[in-house]
Amino acid sequence: NLKELEQGIEDKSYLVITFDYESHQLLNKNNIKHEISDSYLNRVELETIQKKSYELVDWFKEEKPNELEYKGVNVGSLMRVEFNYFLVPFLKNFVAIIKIYQKYSSAEFSASIPLHEIVKTLTNNVKKLNENSATKEEFYYDSVLIPLKIKNHSFSFKLSKNRFLKLKNISEKSIHQFFGPKKLHTNEKSILLVEFDPVRYRHFLSTSKNASSIMLYNRRRPTIWNSNSYNSIKKSNCRIVTLYDLMNKNLEINIKNGESSVEDKVSSSLSNTDFLEAYFSIYDHSFWKIIEKKFKNLLKKRFIDSIKEIEIASKLLEKYQFSSIVVWSEIGSTEQIIVKLAKKHSIPVVLLQHGLFFDDELEGTNRMNKFRGVFPVDSDETIVWGHIEKNHQLKNGIREENIQVLGNPYYDRIRNRPNPKINHILLATSGPVIENSIDLTIETIEKNQATIKKICEVTTNL
Protein backbone atom coordinates (compact mmCIF):
# COMPACT_ATOMS: atom_id res chain seq x y z
CA ASN A 1 0.00 0.00 0.00
CA LEU A 2 1.97 2.99 -1.29
CA LYS A 3 -0.24 5.60 0.40
CA GLU A 4 0.25 3.93 3.77
CA LEU A 5 4.00 3.90 3.20
CA GLU A 6 4.04 7.60 2.33
CA GLN A 7 2.02 8.46 5.44
CA GLY A 8 4.23 6.34 7.66
CA ILE A 9 7.38 7.96 6.29
CA GLU A 10 5.92 11.44 6.84
CA ASP A 11 5.10 10.51 10.45
CA LYS A 12 8.70 9.25 10.79
CA SER A 13 7.35 5.93 12.03
CA TYR A 14 8.37 3.88 8.98
CA LEU A 15 11.75 3.01 7.54
CA VAL A 16 11.29 1.34 4.15
CA ILE A 17 14.02 -1.00 2.90
CA THR A 18 13.82 -2.68 -0.51
CA PHE A 19 15.39 -6.04 -1.29
CA ASP A 20 15.04 -6.18 -5.08
CA TYR A 21 15.45 -3.94 -8.10
CA GLU A 22 11.76 -3.94 -9.08
CA SER A 23 10.66 -2.62 -5.66
CA HIS A 24 13.41 -0.01 -5.77
CA GLN A 25 12.19 1.14 -9.20
CA LEU A 26 8.55 1.26 -8.07
CA LEU A 27 9.31 3.39 -5.02
CA ASN A 28 11.56 5.69 -7.02
CA LYS A 29 8.83 6.14 -9.62
CA ASN A 30 6.40 7.19 -6.87
CA ASN A 31 8.99 9.38 -5.12
CA ILE A 32 8.83 7.32 -1.94
CA LYS A 33 11.88 7.63 0.26
CA HIS A 34 13.56 4.33 1.01
CA GLU A 35 16.82 2.53 1.65
CA ILE A 36 18.15 -0.49 -0.21
CA SER A 37 19.26 -3.62 1.61
CA ASP A 38 22.57 -3.56 -0.29
CA SER A 39 23.68 -0.61 1.84
CA TYR A 40 23.89 -2.94 4.84
CA LEU A 41 26.37 -5.23 3.09
CA ASN A 42 29.99 -4.48 2.24
CA ARG A 43 32.11 -6.01 -0.52
CA VAL A 44 33.74 -8.56 1.78
CA GLU A 45 30.34 -9.81 2.96
CA LEU A 46 29.09 -10.14 -0.62
CA GLU A 47 32.19 -12.15 -1.54
CA THR A 48 31.71 -14.30 1.56
CA ILE A 49 28.11 -15.01 0.52
CA GLN A 50 29.31 -16.14 -2.92
CA LYS A 51 32.06 -18.33 -1.50
CA LYS A 52 29.70 -19.83 1.06
CA SER A 53 27.15 -20.74 -1.60
CA TYR A 54 29.81 -22.59 -3.62
CA GLU A 55 30.66 -24.55 -0.47
CA LEU A 56 27.08 -25.29 0.59
CA VAL A 57 25.99 -26.79 -2.75
CA ASP A 58 28.44 -29.63 -2.04
CA TRP A 59 26.49 -30.62 1.08
CA PHE A 60 25.98 -34.14 -0.30
CA LYS A 61 29.72 -34.84 0.03
CA GLU A 62 29.70 -34.22 3.78
CA GLU A 63 26.95 -36.47 5.19
CA LYS A 64 26.11 -39.97 3.87
CA PRO A 65 27.63 -39.29 0.42
CA ASN A 66 26.55 -42.66 -0.99
CA GLU A 67 22.91 -42.29 0.07
CA LEU A 68 22.01 -40.16 -2.95
CA GLU A 69 23.83 -42.29 -5.52
CA TYR A 70 21.93 -44.07 -8.26
CA LYS A 71 23.89 -46.27 -10.66
CA GLY A 72 27.09 -44.42 -9.76
CA VAL A 73 25.63 -40.93 -10.29
CA ASN A 74 25.20 -38.69 -7.25
CA VAL A 75 21.87 -36.85 -7.51
CA GLY A 76 23.12 -34.18 -5.10
CA SER A 77 25.76 -33.26 -7.67
CA LEU A 78 23.15 -32.96 -10.43
CA MET A 79 21.32 -30.20 -8.55
CA ARG A 80 24.37 -28.11 -7.59
CA VAL A 81 23.71 -25.42 -10.22
CA GLU A 82 20.01 -25.07 -9.43
CA PHE A 83 20.68 -25.04 -5.68
CA ASN A 84 23.22 -22.25 -6.21
CA TYR A 85 20.57 -20.25 -8.12
CA PHE A 86 18.43 -20.48 -4.99
CA LEU A 87 21.13 -20.00 -2.37
CA VAL A 88 22.89 -16.84 -3.58
CA PRO A 89 19.86 -14.50 -3.51
CA PHE A 90 18.59 -16.19 -0.34
CA LEU A 91 21.90 -15.74 1.50
CA LYS A 92 22.17 -12.13 0.36
CA ASN A 93 18.75 -11.39 1.88
CA PHE A 94 19.50 -13.50 4.97
CA VAL A 95 22.74 -11.68 5.81
CA ALA A 96 21.22 -8.27 5.04
CA ILE A 97 18.31 -8.95 7.42
CA ILE A 98 20.73 -10.04 10.16
CA LYS A 99 22.61 -6.75 9.75
CA ILE A 100 19.37 -4.73 9.71
CA TYR A 101 18.11 -6.49 12.83
CA GLN A 102 21.38 -5.84 14.65
CA LYS A 103 20.88 -2.12 14.00
CA TYR A 104 17.13 -2.00 14.73
CA SER A 105 16.61 -4.88 17.17
CA SER A 106 13.84 -3.10 19.11
CA ALA A 107 11.81 -2.17 16.02
CA GLU A 108 8.58 -3.73 14.82
CA PHE A 109 9.10 -5.37 11.43
CA SER A 110 6.75 -5.89 8.50
CA ALA A 111 7.96 -8.09 5.68
CA SER A 112 6.81 -9.90 2.55
CA ILE A 113 6.16 -13.61 3.00
CA PRO A 114 9.63 -14.86 1.88
CA LEU A 115 11.43 -12.26 4.02
CA HIS A 116 9.07 -12.87 6.95
CA GLU A 117 10.39 -16.45 7.14
CA ILE A 118 13.86 -15.03 7.79
CA VAL A 119 12.90 -12.21 10.17
CA LYS A 120 10.83 -14.47 12.44
CA THR A 121 13.96 -16.51 13.26
CA LEU A 122 15.40 -13.35 14.83
CA THR A 123 12.37 -11.74 16.50
CA ASN A 124 8.70 -12.36 17.24
CA ASN A 125 7.98 -8.70 16.64
CA VAL A 126 7.19 -9.14 12.94
CA LYS A 127 4.06 -9.31 10.79
CA LYS A 128 3.46 -10.42 7.22
CA LEU A 129 2.73 -8.04 4.39
CA ASN A 130 0.01 -9.20 1.96
CA GLU A 131 -0.69 -12.16 4.21
CA ASN A 132 -3.54 -13.42 2.04
CA SER A 133 -1.55 -13.37 -1.20
CA ALA A 134 -0.65 -16.77 -2.60
CA THR A 135 3.03 -17.63 -3.00
CA LYS A 136 3.91 -20.32 -5.50
CA GLU A 137 6.92 -22.48 -4.76
CA GLU A 138 8.96 -22.60 -7.95
CA PHE A 139 12.56 -23.58 -8.52
CA TYR A 140 14.77 -22.35 -11.33
CA TYR A 141 14.37 -25.40 -13.56
CA ASP A 142 10.62 -25.73 -12.96
CA SER A 143 10.06 -23.52 -16.00
CA VAL A 144 11.69 -22.95 -19.38
CA LEU A 145 12.22 -19.59 -21.04
CA ILE A 146 11.37 -19.83 -24.76
CA PRO A 147 13.07 -17.20 -26.96
CA LEU A 148 11.22 -15.92 -30.03
CA LYS A 149 12.23 -13.58 -32.81
CA ILE A 150 9.76 -11.94 -35.20
CA LYS A 151 11.54 -9.84 -37.81
CA ASN A 152 13.77 -7.49 -35.81
CA HIS A 153 11.99 -8.00 -32.52
CA SER A 154 13.15 -10.53 -29.94
CA PHE A 155 11.17 -11.58 -26.90
CA SER A 156 10.62 -14.61 -24.72
CA PHE A 157 7.88 -16.33 -22.76
CA LYS A 158 7.90 -18.84 -19.93
CA LEU A 159 6.52 -22.38 -20.05
CA SER A 160 6.27 -24.80 -17.15
CA LYS A 161 8.78 -27.62 -17.42
CA ASN A 162 6.01 -30.23 -17.61
CA ARG A 163 4.25 -28.47 -20.47
CA PHE A 164 7.53 -27.93 -22.28
CA LEU A 165 8.42 -31.64 -22.02
CA LYS A 166 4.98 -32.66 -23.30
CA LEU A 167 5.43 -30.46 -26.38
CA LYS A 168 8.99 -31.72 -26.83
CA ASN A 169 7.84 -35.35 -26.68
CA ILE A 170 5.14 -34.69 -29.29
CA SER A 171 7.66 -33.10 -31.66
CA GLU A 172 10.09 -35.98 -31.18
CA LYS A 173 7.67 -38.48 -32.69
CA SER A 174 8.28 -36.93 -36.11
CA ILE A 175 11.97 -36.36 -35.39
CA HIS A 176 12.42 -40.05 -34.57
CA GLN A 177 10.61 -41.08 -37.74
CA PHE A 178 12.77 -38.97 -40.08
CA PHE A 179 16.09 -38.59 -38.26
CA GLY A 180 16.22 -41.44 -35.75
CA PRO A 181 19.20 -43.85 -35.76
CA LYS A 182 17.09 -46.82 -36.87
CA LYS A 183 19.36 -47.50 -39.87
CA LEU A 184 22.46 -47.51 -37.68
CA HIS A 185 23.77 -50.92 -36.70
CA THR A 186 23.99 -51.21 -32.94
CA ASN A 187 27.63 -52.36 -33.16
CA GLU A 188 28.67 -49.55 -35.53
CA LYS A 189 30.77 -47.00 -33.66
CA SER A 190 29.55 -43.40 -33.55
CA ILE A 191 30.35 -40.06 -31.93
CA LEU A 192 27.78 -38.81 -29.43
CA LEU A 193 27.20 -35.05 -29.10
CA VAL A 194 25.38 -34.17 -25.88
CA GLU A 195 23.02 -31.14 -25.66
CA PHE A 196 24.37 -29.58 -28.86
CA ASP A 197 22.62 -26.76 -30.72
CA PRO A 198 22.45 -27.81 -34.42
CA VAL A 199 22.11 -24.18 -35.54
CA ARG A 200 25.12 -22.91 -33.64
CA TYR A 201 27.19 -25.91 -34.74
CA ARG A 202 25.73 -26.26 -38.24
CA HIS A 203 29.04 -25.65 -40.03
CA PHE A 204 30.77 -28.18 -37.80
CA LEU A 205 28.06 -30.78 -38.50
CA SER A 206 27.85 -30.17 -42.25
CA THR A 207 31.62 -30.35 -42.82
CA SER A 208 32.34 -33.30 -40.53
CA LYS A 209 33.54 -36.41 -42.30
CA ASN A 210 31.18 -39.34 -41.87
CA ALA A 211 28.52 -37.09 -40.36
CA SER A 212 26.11 -40.01 -40.56
CA SER A 213 28.04 -41.57 -37.66
CA ILE A 214 27.34 -38.54 -35.45
CA MET A 215 24.44 -38.84 -33.04
CA LEU A 216 22.80 -35.98 -31.15
CA TYR A 217 21.38 -36.55 -27.67
CA ASN A 218 19.43 -33.55 -26.40
CA ARG A 219 17.29 -34.05 -23.30
CA ARG A 220 16.97 -30.46 -22.07
CA ARG A 221 16.32 -28.81 -25.41
CA PRO A 222 14.58 -29.81 -28.64
CA THR A 223 17.00 -30.70 -31.42
CA ILE A 224 14.72 -29.31 -34.14
CA TRP A 225 12.55 -26.27 -33.41
CA ASN A 226 12.67 -24.11 -36.57
CA SER A 227 13.66 -24.19 -40.25
CA ASN A 228 17.33 -23.46 -39.52
CA SER A 229 17.70 -26.38 -37.13
CA TYR A 230 15.78 -28.66 -39.52
CA ASN A 231 18.01 -27.69 -42.46
CA SER A 232 21.15 -28.15 -40.39
CA ILE A 233 20.19 -31.71 -39.42
CA LYS A 234 19.01 -32.59 -42.92
CA LYS A 235 22.16 -31.25 -44.56
CA SER A 236 24.52 -32.95 -42.13
CA ASN A 237 22.76 -36.32 -42.22
CA CYS A 238 23.54 -36.87 -38.53
CA ARG A 239 21.16 -38.94 -36.40
CA ILE A 240 19.02 -37.85 -33.43
CA VAL A 241 18.40 -40.08 -30.42
CA THR A 242 15.01 -39.55 -28.76
CA LEU A 243 13.00 -41.34 -26.12
CA TYR A 244 11.10 -43.16 -28.88
CA ASP A 245 14.31 -44.93 -29.85
CA LEU A 246 15.09 -46.08 -26.31
CA MET A 247 11.87 -46.60 -24.35
CA ASN A 248 10.54 -50.11 -23.86
CA LYS A 249 8.78 -52.10 -21.13
CA ASN A 250 11.97 -53.00 -19.28
CA LEU A 251 13.08 -49.37 -19.19
CA GLU A 252 9.67 -48.29 -17.86
CA ILE A 253 9.90 -50.92 -15.10
CA ASN A 254 13.45 -49.83 -14.16
CA ILE A 255 12.33 -46.21 -13.90
CA LYS A 256 9.33 -47.08 -11.70
CA ASN A 257 11.43 -49.30 -9.45
CA GLY A 258 14.01 -46.54 -9.07
CA GLU A 259 11.39 -43.91 -8.29
CA SER A 260 9.89 -46.08 -5.54
CA SER A 261 13.09 -45.70 -3.50
CA VAL A 262 13.20 -41.88 -3.60
CA GLU A 263 11.22 -41.18 -0.42
CA ASP A 264 13.42 -43.45 1.71
CA LYS A 265 16.68 -42.15 0.21
CA VAL A 266 15.74 -38.50 0.72
CA SER A 267 14.57 -39.11 4.30
CA SER A 268 17.75 -41.01 5.12
CA SER A 269 20.08 -38.42 3.58
CA LEU A 270 18.40 -35.61 5.56
CA SER A 271 17.96 -37.49 8.85
CA ASN A 272 20.86 -35.87 10.74
CA THR A 273 19.21 -32.61 11.80
CA ASP A 274 22.12 -31.53 14.01
CA PHE A 275 24.53 -31.76 11.08
CA LEU A 276 22.19 -29.90 8.71
CA GLU A 277 21.52 -27.07 11.17
CA ALA A 278 25.24 -26.60 11.74
CA TYR A 279 26.19 -26.97 8.09
CA PHE A 280 23.60 -24.61 6.62
CA SER A 281 24.71 -21.53 8.49
CA ILE A 282 26.57 -18.28 7.87
CA TYR A 283 28.03 -15.83 10.36
CA ASP A 284 26.99 -18.22 13.16
CA HIS A 285 23.32 -18.07 12.15
CA SER A 286 21.67 -21.30 10.97
CA PHE A 287 19.05 -21.05 8.23
CA TRP A 288 18.29 -24.77 7.84
CA LYS A 289 14.80 -24.50 9.35
CA ILE A 290 13.95 -21.72 6.89
CA ILE A 291 14.90 -23.70 3.79
CA GLU A 292 14.23 -27.25 5.06
CA LYS A 293 10.79 -27.73 3.48
CA LYS A 294 11.77 -26.17 0.13
CA PHE A 295 15.01 -28.09 0.02
CA LYS A 296 13.32 -31.44 0.66
CA ASN A 297 10.78 -30.71 -2.06
CA LEU A 298 13.56 -29.76 -4.49
CA LEU A 299 15.55 -32.89 -3.67
CA LYS A 300 12.52 -35.17 -4.16
CA LYS A 301 11.59 -33.52 -7.46
CA ARG A 302 15.08 -33.71 -8.89
CA PHE A 303 15.71 -37.24 -7.59
CA ILE A 304 12.65 -38.49 -9.49
CA ASP A 305 13.71 -36.56 -12.61
CA SER A 306 17.27 -37.86 -12.32
CA ILE A 307 16.34 -41.53 -12.01
CA LYS A 308 14.47 -41.34 -15.30
CA GLU A 309 17.37 -39.55 -17.02
CA ILE A 310 19.96 -41.97 -15.63
CA GLU A 311 17.96 -44.99 -16.80
CA ILE A 312 17.46 -43.50 -20.28
CA ALA A 313 21.16 -42.64 -20.60
CA SER A 314 22.12 -46.13 -19.42
CA LYS A 315 19.91 -47.63 -22.13
CA LEU A 316 21.52 -45.37 -24.75
CA LEU A 317 25.07 -46.46 -23.87
CA GLU A 318 24.02 -50.11 -23.76
CA LYS A 319 22.25 -50.01 -27.13
CA TYR A 320 24.91 -48.20 -29.18
CA GLN A 321 28.68 -48.32 -29.46
CA PHE A 322 30.36 -44.91 -29.19
CA SER A 323 33.99 -44.25 -30.02
CA SER A 324 33.84 -40.94 -28.12
CA ILE A 325 31.44 -38.51 -26.49
CA VAL A 326 31.61 -34.71 -26.80
CA VAL A 327 30.11 -32.37 -24.19
CA TRP A 328 30.39 -28.61 -23.92
CA SER A 329 29.83 -28.62 -20.16
CA GLU A 330 30.43 -30.92 -17.22
CA ILE A 331 27.92 -29.22 -14.93
CA GLY A 332 24.65 -29.74 -16.82
CA SER A 333 22.59 -32.64 -15.47
CA THR A 334 22.45 -34.51 -18.81
CA GLU A 335 26.19 -34.08 -19.29
CA GLN A 336 27.05 -35.20 -15.76
CA ILE A 337 24.98 -38.35 -16.16
CA ILE A 338 26.48 -39.23 -19.55
CA VAL A 339 30.05 -38.52 -18.41
CA LYS A 340 29.72 -40.67 -15.28
CA LEU A 341 28.13 -43.57 -17.17
CA ALA A 342 30.69 -43.26 -19.99
CA LYS A 343 33.42 -44.09 -17.48
CA LYS A 344 31.71 -47.43 -16.78
CA HIS A 345 31.71 -48.20 -20.51
CA SER A 346 35.32 -46.98 -21.02
CA ILE A 347 34.18 -44.38 -23.57
CA PRO A 348 36.51 -41.35 -23.85
CA VAL A 349 34.87 -37.98 -23.20
CA VAL A 350 35.93 -34.67 -24.75
CA LEU A 351 35.02 -31.29 -23.22
CA LEU A 352 34.54 -28.58 -25.86
CA GLN A 353 35.11 -24.95 -24.88
CA HIS A 354 31.77 -23.16 -25.24
CA GLY A 355 32.50 -19.55 -24.29
CA LEU A 356 35.05 -16.94 -23.29
CA PHE A 357 36.19 -17.51 -19.73
CA PHE A 358 37.63 -15.15 -17.15
CA ASP A 359 41.32 -16.05 -17.00
CA ASP A 360 42.69 -13.76 -14.27
CA GLU A 361 44.35 -15.28 -11.22
CA LEU A 362 41.97 -13.94 -8.57
CA GLU A 363 40.76 -16.48 -6.02
CA GLY A 364 37.10 -15.62 -6.61
CA THR A 365 37.46 -16.01 -10.39
CA ASN A 366 39.20 -19.35 -10.04
CA ARG A 367 36.49 -20.58 -7.68
CA MET A 368 33.78 -19.47 -10.12
CA ASN A 369 35.51 -21.16 -13.08
CA LYS A 370 35.78 -24.45 -11.21
CA PHE A 371 32.12 -24.28 -10.23
CA ARG A 372 31.08 -23.53 -13.83
CA GLY A 373 33.04 -26.46 -15.22
CA VAL A 374 35.64 -24.49 -17.18
CA PHE A 375 38.30 -27.10 -16.45
CA PRO A 376 37.84 -30.80 -17.29
CA VAL A 377 37.36 -32.92 -14.18
CA ASP A 378 35.84 -36.13 -15.51
CA SER A 379 36.52 -35.57 -19.24
CA ASP A 380 39.57 -37.22 -20.76
CA GLU A 381 40.49 -34.30 -23.03
CA THR A 382 39.47 -30.71 -23.65
CA ILE A 383 39.27 -28.79 -26.93
CA VAL A 384 39.92 -25.05 -26.61
CA TRP A 385 39.62 -22.18 -29.07
CA GLY A 386 43.17 -20.85 -28.87
CA HIS A 387 46.46 -20.60 -27.00
CA ILE A 388 45.16 -18.07 -24.45
CA GLU A 389 42.71 -20.60 -23.08
CA LYS A 390 45.28 -23.38 -23.43
CA ASN A 391 47.66 -21.44 -21.15
CA HIS A 392 44.77 -20.80 -18.75
CA GLN A 393 44.10 -24.55 -18.59
CA LEU A 394 47.79 -25.35 -18.09
CA LYS A 395 48.05 -22.88 -15.19
CA ASN A 396 45.20 -24.72 -13.50
CA GLY A 397 46.83 -28.12 -13.63
CA ILE A 398 45.47 -29.58 -16.87
CA ARG A 399 48.11 -31.69 -18.61
CA GLU A 400 49.26 -30.42 -22.01
CA GLU A 401 48.67 -33.76 -23.73
CA ASN A 402 45.00 -33.50 -22.72
CA ILE A 403 44.48 -30.11 -24.40
CA GLN A 404 43.80 -29.65 -28.12
CA VAL A 405 43.68 -26.21 -29.81
CA LEU A 406 41.17 -26.44 -32.67
CA GLY A 407 39.58 -22.99 -32.90
CA ASN A 408 35.96 -22.02 -32.38
CA PRO A 409 33.46 -24.08 -34.42
CA TYR A 410 30.81 -21.34 -33.99
CA TYR A 411 32.67 -18.98 -36.26
CA ASP A 412 34.22 -21.23 -38.91
CA ARG A 413 31.59 -20.17 -41.44
CA ILE A 414 32.23 -16.45 -40.90
CA ARG A 415 35.61 -16.55 -42.67
CA ASN A 416 33.99 -16.86 -46.08
CA ARG A 417 31.40 -14.14 -45.56
CA PRO A 418 31.74 -10.93 -47.59
CA ASN A 419 31.90 -7.71 -45.61
CA PRO A 420 28.37 -6.29 -45.22
CA LYS A 421 27.57 -3.03 -46.99
CA ILE A 422 25.64 -1.75 -43.99
CA ASN A 423 27.70 -1.19 -40.86
CA HIS A 424 26.49 -2.97 -37.74
CA ILE A 425 27.77 -2.83 -34.20
CA LEU A 426 27.57 -5.99 -32.12
CA LEU A 427 27.34 -5.29 -28.40
CA ALA A 428 28.60 -8.58 -26.98
CA THR A 429 27.92 -8.24 -23.29
CA SER A 430 26.23 -10.29 -20.62
CA GLY A 431 24.15 -8.59 -17.96
CA PRO A 432 24.06 -9.24 -14.22
CA VAL A 433 23.14 -12.80 -13.24
CA ILE A 434 21.13 -14.06 -10.26
CA GLU A 435 23.77 -16.58 -9.18
CA ASN A 436 26.32 -13.86 -8.40
CA SER A 437 25.94 -11.89 -5.17
CA ILE A 438 27.59 -8.72 -6.49
CA ASP A 439 25.53 -8.84 -9.69
CA LEU A 440 22.37 -8.81 -7.54
CA THR A 441 23.15 -5.38 -6.08
CA ILE A 442 21.23 -2.33 -7.31
CA GLU A 443 24.52 -0.56 -7.98
CA THR A 444 25.69 -3.28 -10.39
CA ILE A 445 22.35 -3.45 -12.20
CA GLU A 446 22.12 0.33 -12.65
CA LYS A 447 25.77 0.60 -13.66
CA ASN A 448 25.25 -2.06 -16.33
CA GLN A 449 22.21 -0.25 -17.73
CA ALA A 450 23.98 3.13 -17.69
CA THR A 451 27.00 1.66 -19.49
CA ILE A 452 24.88 0.17 -22.28
CA LYS A 453 22.94 3.43 -22.69
CA LYS A 454 26.19 5.40 -22.90
CA ILE A 455 27.65 3.04 -25.49
CA CYS A 456 24.49 3.38 -27.59
CA GLU A 457 24.61 7.18 -27.34
CA VAL A 458 28.26 7.34 -28.36
CA THR A 459 28.01 4.85 -31.23
CA THR A 460 24.82 6.47 -32.58
CA ASN A 461 26.77 9.68 -33.12
CA LEU A 462 29.70 8.02 -34.92
Describe each model-derived feature in a short phrase.
Residues 1-462:
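Catalytic-core helical/loop segments in enzymes performing group transfer/polymerization on anionic/lipid-linked
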